[in-house]
UniProtKB/Swiss-Prot annotation:
Tissue expression remark: Red blood cells.
Quaternary structure annotation from Swiss-Prot or TrEMBL: Heterotetramer of two alpha chains and two beta chains.
Official protein name in the record: Hemoglobin subunit beta
Pfam families: Globin
Family from the record: Belongs to the globin family.
Origin species: Pelophylax lessonae (Pool frog)
Keywords: Heme, Iron, Metal-binding, Oxygen transport, Transport
A GO CC annotation given for this chain: hemoglobin complex
Domain called Globin: residue spans: 1-140
């Protein structure tokens, strides 16, 4: 599974996919906007989809998820600092990690329709789930 994801990941444009996915998360699950109060105008779907801070942060998030592919046996240690930050500083509900993973799957399927096989989806879902679990580690 992870070889399949690693091979696919090289085709993923973190800027385009990450920005679109985070924007989609904020539109589809509006309560997640409370974590982004410093990002400026989130008043409409259009504003969110064109918000430079949302797009840049989405790229950063997707790049961090991609970094996890280099540490498949050690995700919890790899994401320990990010887990603490999201738990202790940002107080992000860990259920949101699963929502974001689902949104990433949706956006990737949209962009890579022809190569988005059930096997790839399964492998991607396993990776996003493992990353979400690692990020939730600091929660008590």
């Amino acid at each position: 599974g992870s070889d399949l994801v690693s091979g696919f990941w090289g085709k993923v444009d973190a800027h385009k996919i990450g920005g679109e996915a985070l924007a989609r998360l904020l539109v589809v699950y509006p309560w997640t906007q409370r974590y982004f109060t410093t990002f400026g105008n989130l008043g409409s779907a259009d504003a969110i989809c064109h918000n430079a801070k949302v797009l840049a942060h989405g790229e950063k998030v997707l790049a961090a998820i991609g970094e996890g592919l280099k540490h498949p046996e050690n995700l919890k240690a790899h994401y320990a600092k990010l887990s603490e930050y999201h738990s202790n500083k940002l107080h992000v509900d860990p259920a949101n990690f699963r929502l974001l993973g689902n949104v990433f799957i949706t956006v990737l399927a949209r962009h890579f329709q022809h190569e988005f096989t059930p096997e790839l989806q399964h492998a991607l879902e396993a990776h996003f789930c493992a990353v979400g679990d690692a990020l939730a580690k600091a929660y008590h």
